[in-house]
């Protein structure tokens, strides 16, 4: 069998794990660097691969939603990460949420046991030599030494934003005399625990939250404490106005406790409905751990315990993990990388995952899949691929690359991370007025393209060039 150049992957997060697996599955040897546990990051709690440091949710599951379409594209492309997410999913209404411990452990075991993947548990302090095919998948918590080398290589100032994680509590510490199980609008199973607030308890909670003590930022962080809008700390939301949380994570619409009476009786509904509702989502398959949805925070731990125990039903909450905030680094990718995820000035170097400025777990996986697939093709001497912009993976890649689709971003001072959304897809050939039907058309078009791509890749893998 023909011997191909090996590929180095730096970082065993979601993108790096996916990339390494795709490369090895193509018959190429991989050296995978992961600095944990030898060197810990500010946000990770374990040394497992693909650890989820923020939420345990990959977003909406339905493929007529942007996040769900991205997941479905990755399923079609045989993503190891999405396969494990499906395997270790936990009830979460219409979302794909996972038992984060089992999920990460399974990916670690699968990747580590692949005969073509060599794991090096050490920091990679600098970029490998130019002849070595390399994927940078170090994520938003790139080590200082490597970040410095990347900065020197790109000649660009680093970009960053602040991200935060929600607290996790034990299920047995929830008071179900007040809290109750339900899903919004009673759709599907009652997968969420809901803690209702009346107007008085909400006002008191808001008052304490906006004056609570926050964990101190380092001096260099204070200068530019930018937050990503999709993951704002709850205290930052509260400071925007007393009603802001009620139109965000504490939205009460569509949530009803049967103990309050008949939801169809308007007089009862007006009298009993909650002013605000805090929701908790299951963290593990056994239902022993629950996270506070939307409660990313940078409050001091003592303040978290004091204030979050003000939530009805959580007065005796036992905290397994407190919320934390950390600095996320990403490159100004529209100036630096191609739609193949190769650096313009070094074709043997790829970037993948949140380092490129995509936002969300599935988007990181998508970057890992594309970078891994292209690195394997490059190692075999074959042409790399770009994905159609009508697919969610292709649209996200175009947004963070120097393609025509991202020229609108190229000259802006502040390039900011982008989550999966239908707004970045090109218009349909037909006019569809109904939004839900329009999203289904986007989905059908994207999945047709992805299936064609899958067939093309299968043809490439069976080509005589690869024997």
Curated annotation (Swiss-Prot):
It holds the Pfam family GIDA. The keyword Transport does not apply. GO terms for molecular function: flavin adenine dinucleotide binding; tRNA (uracil(54)-C5)-methyltransferase activity, 5,10-methylenetetrahydrofolate-dependent. Keywords: Cytoplasm, FAD, Flavoprotein, Methyltransferase, NAD, NADP, Transferase, tRNA processing. Belongs to the MnmG family. TrmFO subfamily. This is Methylenetetrahydrofolate--tRNA-(uracil-5-)-methyltransferase TrmFO. FAD binds at residues 11-16. The gene is trmFO. Its cofactor is FAD. Disulfide bonds: none annotated. GO terms for biological process: tRNA methylation; tRNA wobble uridine modification. Catalyzes the folate-dependent formation of 5-methyl-uridine at position 54 (M-5-U54) in all tRNAs. Its EC number is 2.1.1.74. Its main location: cytoplasm. It is found in: Cytoplasm.
């Amino acid at each position: 069998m023909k011997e191909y150049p090996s590929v180095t992957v730096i970082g065993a997060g979601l993108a790096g794990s996916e990339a390494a697996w795709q490369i090895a599955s193509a018959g190429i040897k991989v050296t995978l660097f992961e600095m944990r546990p030898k060197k810990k990051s500010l946000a990770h709690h374990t040394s497992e691969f693909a650890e989820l440091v923020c939420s345990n949710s990959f977003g909406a599951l339905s493929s007529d939603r942007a996040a769900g379409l991205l997941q479905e594209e990755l399923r079609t492309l045989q993503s190891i990460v999405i396969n494990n997410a499906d395997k270790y999913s936990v009830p979460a209404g219409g979302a794909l949420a996972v038992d984060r411990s089992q999920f990460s452990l399974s990916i670690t075991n699968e990747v580590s046991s692949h005969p073509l993947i060599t794991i090096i548990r050490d920091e990679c302090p600098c970029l490998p030599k130019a002849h070595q095919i390399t994927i940078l998948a170090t994520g938003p918590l790139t080590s200082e030494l490597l970040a410095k080398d990347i900065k020197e290589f790109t000649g660009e100032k680093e970009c960053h934003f602040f991200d935060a994680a929600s607290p996790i509590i034990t299920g047995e510490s929830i008071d179900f005399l007040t809290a109750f199980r339900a899903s919004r609008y009673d759709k599907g199973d009652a997968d969420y625990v809901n803690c209702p607030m009346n107007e008085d308890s909400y006002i008191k909670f808001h008052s304490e939250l906006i004056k609570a003590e926050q964990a101190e930022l380092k001096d260099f962080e204070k200068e530019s404490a930018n937050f990503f809008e999709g993951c704002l700390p709850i205290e930052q939301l509260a400071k925007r106005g007393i009603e802001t949380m009620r139109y965000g994570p504490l939205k009460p619409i569509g949530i009803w406790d049967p103990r309050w009476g008949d939801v169809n009786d308007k007089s009862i509904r007006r009298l009993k409905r909650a002013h605000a509702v805090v929701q908790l989502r299951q963290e593990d398959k056994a239902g022993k751990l629950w996270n506070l949805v939307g409660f990313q925070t940078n409050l001091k731990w003592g303040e978290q315990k004091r204030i979050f125990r003000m939530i009805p039903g959580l007065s005796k909450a036992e905290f397994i993990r407190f919320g934390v905030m950390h600095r996320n680094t990403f490159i100004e990718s529209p100036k630096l990388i191609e739609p193949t995820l190769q650096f313009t000035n070094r074709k043997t170097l790829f970037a993948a995952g949140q380092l490129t400025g995509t936002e969300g777990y599935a988007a990181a996986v998508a970057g890992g899949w594309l970078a891994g697939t292209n690195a394997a093709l490059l190692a075999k001497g074959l042409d790399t691929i770009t994905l159609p912009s009508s697919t969610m993976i292709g649209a996200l890649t175009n947004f963070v690359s120097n393609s025509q689709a991202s020229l609108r971003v190229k000259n802006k001072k502040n390039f900011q991370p982008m989550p999966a959304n239908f707004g970045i897809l090109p218009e349909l050939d037909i006019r569809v007025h109904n939004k839900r039907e329009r999203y289904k058309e986007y989905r059908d078009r994207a999945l047709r393209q992805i299936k064609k791509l899958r067939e093309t890749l299968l043809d490439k893998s069976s080509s005589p060039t690869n024997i």
